[in-house]
């Protein structure tokens, strides 16, 4: 028995809400994945503030219809698709998908969409290679701390050098 019109409209509404909250969408070919493996993927994504939805391409097409930010996703809507919708830390979500794919060797990323632009496989891998927000903040804090330390050492060195010169002069060595 197929879904009722109300059920389909509800799914399209949920997809529209998820898309409105998402920054990045990945389209995966999930053919061959077991229910256990899909549950594993969903658990991994949940930790990275992402969600994996399996829905008919026609329902996703209806959800993106008229939305210029997501309209380019239409070209990826063929075959059996799972949609990974990532909000927040996109790098963590992409890393979770890639780690899952590396372990299972069953699913394949067809492509993605970020800020209205279709992403190739290489661009998706580049996003995964980016450091997380926390790592960037730590690097910046380390750089700022290093500069402050160098300034403090430099300021401290001036009186120390002067004191050594005065001591040497007082001991009678004019070199």
Swiss-Prot record:
| Source domain of life | Bacteria
Which InterPro entries does UniProt cross-reference here? Ribosomal_uL10, Ribosomal_uL10-like_sf, Ribosomal_uL10_bac, Ribosomal_uL10_bac_type
- GO CC terms for this protein? ribonucleoprotein complex; ribosome
For this protein, the parts annotated as crossing the membrane are none
Q: Which residues form a coiled coil?
A: none
In which family does this protein belong, per the annotation? Belongs to the universal ribosomal protein uL10 family.
Q: Which HAMAP family match?
A: Ribosomal_uL10
Q: What is this protein called?
A: Large ribosomal subunit protein uL10
Q: What is the lineage of its organism?
A: Bacteria, Bacillati, Cyanobacteriota, Cyanophyceae, Synechococcales
